[in-house]
Amino acid sequence: MTSVLLTRPLTQVAALEALVTNSGHQPLLFPTLEIQALKAKVKCKHYDAVIFISANAVEFGLEILKKITYSAIFTVGVATAKKLNDYHIEVDDFPKKNPSSEALLALDSVSCLRDKKILIFRGRGGRETLRIGFEKNDNTVEYAQVYDRVICSLSEQHQKSLDVFLSGSKGFVSVTSNENLDGLIVLAKQTGQLDSIKNYPLIVLSARTKSYAQTCGFQQIIVTPDISDQAIASVLE
């Protein structure tokens, strides 16, 4: 049985854990990040466009969204759009393939925005691609930073999962973002096992994370066909 080291936050890993188990592999939980809510305030009551960066942004930004009005709502990808749909909120548009800030900016429905007030729901920090892109068209951009990603403290669970994982000659490591990978590196360094982990294939969700992983010294990297949990499970076969 092949082991799969799952680095998602514990609150978000259950579905992927079940898929890995059902595919005949052994999931090992190694959460690298905790998602913590931030108190955010917005300046306006109405925005021409509202954008959600991630499913976490939806989860933690929903209360603010209920208190404002907006003309259009966009997401960076299908998973975030689905999260809004789960709350019966209709999304106007999102990139259907290769979800990214660049792909969102390239949409006809988004590139036409000019002289508009735009609110972006996101986590603390992150890339400035959207802000820069929108400001080129004289839009006013505001952030609602509604959550933070904090690297987990090393626990007995981490050590136990890692010991089981490294005892096998075959295995995969699944990471879902650059920040997720940063957390893995920090925790692996604390255990003294980073070089050992780099001997195993790393499963990532995008070419951007692949490039970042390469700069971090990972060489065996598999990019999933899309960002779904099913896509992660499919590359294990």
What is each of the regions a protein language model found here?
Residues 1-237:
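Signature of uroporphyrinogen-III synthase
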